[in-house]
Amino acid sequence: MAEELVLETCDLQCERNGREHRTEEMGSQQLVVRRGQPFTITLNFAGRGYEEGVDKLAFDVETGPCPVETSGTRSHFTLTDCPEEGTWSAVLQQQDGATLCVSLCSPSIARVGRYRLTLEASTGYQGSSFHLGDFVLLFNAWHPEDAVYLKEEDERREYVLSQQGLIYMGSRDYITSTPWNFGQFEDEILAICLEMLDINPKFLRDQNLDCSRRNDPVYIGRVVSAMVNCNDEDHGVLLGRWDNHYEDGMSPMAWIGSVDILKRWRRLGCQPVKYGQCWVFAAVACTVMRCLGVPSRVVTNYNSAHDTNGNLVIDRYLSETGMEERRSTDMIWNFHCWVECWMTRPDLAPGYDGWQALDPTPQEKSEGVYCCGPAPVKAIKEGDLQVQYDIPFVFAEVNADVVYWIVQSDGEKKKSTHSSVVGKNISTKSVGRDSREDITHTYKYPEGSEKEREVFSKAEHEKSSLGEQEEGLHMRIKLSEGANNGSDFDVFAFISNDTDKERECRLRLCARTASYNGEVGPQCGFKDLLNLSLQPHMEQSVPLRILYEQYGPNLTQDNMIKVVALLTEYETGDSVVAIRDVYIQNPEIKIRILGEPMQERKLVAEIRLVNPLAEPLNNCIFVVEGAGLTEGQRIEELEDPVEPQAEAKFRMEFVPRQAGLHKLMVDFESDKLTGVKGYRNVIIAPLPK
């Protein structure tokens, strides 16, 4: 009888498999593979080699704390000559004496997560078991049978493999972009993402059920949406805060990447990191989903409605002086960010595959938990409010009507309705380019089109009862060129009288500093014209000067000023409202790269910023990071104040680890100028072979 097989070594071929599965940037010390795609391991036996017909080889793969075959968290399969579809398989590739090359493959519906791999070798009645090591299995956007399959290679590179991106902010009238280091392949990030799954409340409640559902990106997306915020006291990653008091943490505007946030969360023992706002929640969720293999992108909706009572109407109240009053919990955010993830929806009727909206910012509860989605973007566009998950809330974010109630001194209220204010310029980064792609058409039909009215009717929203008021007077607010931080600037109310007679009116213009979520601060400009005569079929403009000395001390991290114009006609008592959010532009950070950009070769970055204010900047800090370029974050604190019109500057050495296109990202903070962002694309040449 042949002596039993004894395994001497096993090579999981981490480097080779990583290249073939596009996971090599996660490191060569662990095996990370994508489901449905074969990976190769090498077995070296001591003494004699494997003999077909004499020896039997089988493999066990297990994931989770209580693996069970019926739950899909354990599989036992034997070595064969050809792979089997739809199940785990092991195929003999090559034998050289005592060395065996075996190709293993998971089904395209396998559970994602960390697996234990075991070899069972038997000869006759003798048998031994050998632990071969652990590996991590991810979703596979390259496999046609995977639920996250994405057809175009350039889209897979952008939405799964790209570690850097741009997030759109500012206002509808002045869209800005901020760089973000997603860093899903950076050290520790994969382990942190898996840990997030293993401490989520659904796992703690029923470990077997939770692990059995990890083959479904819909389920994973819902878990991640809940775990990125901490509002359910579930060991979530980020604590949200919107009141401009961030002294005991980080201002949301100061972050430039997810890596620092996720590492802090782990270092804190899975306690919330302070603080996040919508783009931070969305960016961290995007990192986690890309890390797990799900195509994901951050999306920005301008003039985003927060409809708390579900009636698809946002009620806002203004005093006679144009000051906003808080009588409703409904809000309009200058912008709001969420994540889109690409996946099929076999849990729904046909037609809802593709991009799904996931919103980890804690706003409203869904099934008792602060999470939102996945909501099929197609269902949002069609007004299919009964489709899972959370369609009514997202539908309102992009479609709600806005009603301004002007509260008069005697308590009487006048109504001014605006039905095409919400859901503008829905934006995401273009594939392969640093430019903005407008995806509004994927969420809604053109404003005022017959199809749009049809969708509203389906959403059981009687839009006709709120028809846009056709006043004979019309008003809009325009901005003079360049509202630069540190400078004075003008805004103009343009008023047109489209009637045949002269109108006597009162105009009030009010400017206040504001946060991006619609909250307003102190007044920084006001004008009250008691007797404004408007000639028939004429337009005239009224300027309002806004001074830095008035807005500067109260400007929030969002660099926003909200201008409200209220025009009241004396004869009828009717009012017209116009509102504009003005974005105050920060100075540019200039970045120069010195040296030949090559892998493993030292480079120098020269970083400069001019102080545009008429007063010194104190406590100046530069924070620099870039996936594949820097080892974590670099922080440079300047010793001296930066005088008016002087430069804040420093030089930094770094050694790029990875070839290809990368972004070097910079954040600047000081006592009077905060959240200033800049980036430079750097193409790193590979090492000569």
UniProtKB/Swiss-Prot annotation:
Annotated spans, Disordered: 427-453
Keyword Transferase: yes
GO cellular component term of the entry, any: mitochondrion
Keyword Protease included in the entry's annotation: yes
Pfam families named among the record's database cross-references: Transglut_C, Transglut_core, Transglut_N
Binding site for GTP: 476-483, 580-583
Essential cofactor(s): Ca(2+)
Site (Important for catalytic activity): residue numbering on this chain: 516
One BP term from GO: positive regulation of small GTPase mediated signal transduction
Record's compositionally biased regions (Basic and acidic residues): 431-441
GO molecular function: calcium ion binding; GTP binding; histone dopaminyltransferase activity; histone serotonyltransferase activity; peptidase activity; peptide histaminyltransferase activity; peptide noradrenalinyltransferase activity; protein-glutamine gamma-glutamyltransferase activity
Family, similarity comment: Belongs to the transglutaminase superfamily. Transglutaminase family.
Binding partners and assembly: Monomer.
Protein name: Protein-glutamine gamma-glutamyltransferase 2
Organism, as annotated: Gallus gallus (Chicken)
